[in-house]
A protein has these predicted regions:
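Helix-to-loop junction immediately C-terminal to a conserved catalytic motif
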Residues: 48
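Conserved ABC transporter NBD signature motif
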Residues: 56-71
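Catalytic Walker B motif of ABC-type/P-loop ATPase nucleotide-binding domains
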Residues: 146-150
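ABC-family P-loop ATPase nucleotide-binding domains
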Residues: 78-133
Length: 248
């Protein structure tokens, strides 16, 4: 069980996280949503101890993070955490040496699924391929908690859609995913829980099954929570063109 209690993080001129509390259990697939600067990436980096938070706590099964349990987490980020001069095969050998839980069969299957070469340096990959490889490594580490930050930036809609189908098929019951993306509609059928962040605060937390029972789509829930103004496009067009747009 991952428990985040009263977490605060401030940068010089901005409160990035403002008393965030969140509990995520084994096997959950959680979507973390919010506008740019809402605190999504900061929260994940605080969970992983990549940056220091000012106050609050992050525990795993009631214990503080140490070198002994940090390996239960993996992180796929579009900032890229791999060794660009090394090949995929070299990465595999490195991970097999350092992570007893490394899932070689999953690694091979995902590399084949995405059609990525094993023998070329990662720096020769396109941006989309680099993001694919980042996700492959995160999923193959054998971690219990897999954090993803805009995992498929630079990939086409077909790759993204197929990946989510594959991911649902390969995840084990104990594997937990915390995923942030702006492509809300694409992950609607994938996630089981939606957590909404706004200005460093959690402003919404709902099970997607409960939203279905209420007759709400995930996008409708997000718009409702953030008080989305449905007429903002028509107002902008009227201001920009000097005429009303009845179809906006």
């Amino acid at each position: 069980m991952l428990e985040i209690k009263d977490l605060c993080k401030r940068y010089v001129d901005k409160q990035a996280l403002d008393h965030v509390s969140l509990t995520v259990g084994p096997g959950e697939i959680v979507g973390l949503f919010g506008e740019n600067g809402a605190g999504k990436t900061t929260l994940k980096k605080c969970i992983l101890s990549l940056i220091r938070y000012d106050s609050g706590s992050v525990t795993l099964d009631g214990a503080a993070f140490t070198r002994a349990n940090i390996g239960r987490f993996s992180f796929a980020t579009c900032e890229h955490s791999f060794f660009p001069a090394l090949s995929a095969q070299a990465h595999r050998e490195f991970y097999e040496e350092h992570f007893e839980t490394f899932l070689s069969r999953r690694f091979e299957g995902l590399m084949e699924f995405f059609g990525l070469p094993m023998d070329k340096p990662i720096r020769s990959f396109s941006t989309g391929q680099k993001n694919q490889f980042e996700v492959i490594m995160a999923l193959s580490q054998g971690a219990d908690y897999i954090l993803m930050d805009e995992p498929f930036a630079g990939n086409d809609v077909f790759n993204r859609e197929d990946f989510y189908k594959v991911l649902l098929g390969i995840l084990e019951p104990h594997e937990t995913v915390i995923l942030s993306t702006h492509l809300i509609e694409e992950v609607t059928g994938f996630i089981g829980r939606a957590v909404l962040l706004h200005e460093g605060k959690i402003v919404g937390d709902a099970q997607t099954a409960a939203l279905d029972e209420q007759g709400l789509t995930l996008m409708e829930y997000v718009k409702q929570t953030f008080s989305y103004q449905s007429d903002r496009v028509s107002k902008a067009l009227a201001e920009l063109t000097g005429r009303e747009d009845d179809d906006a």
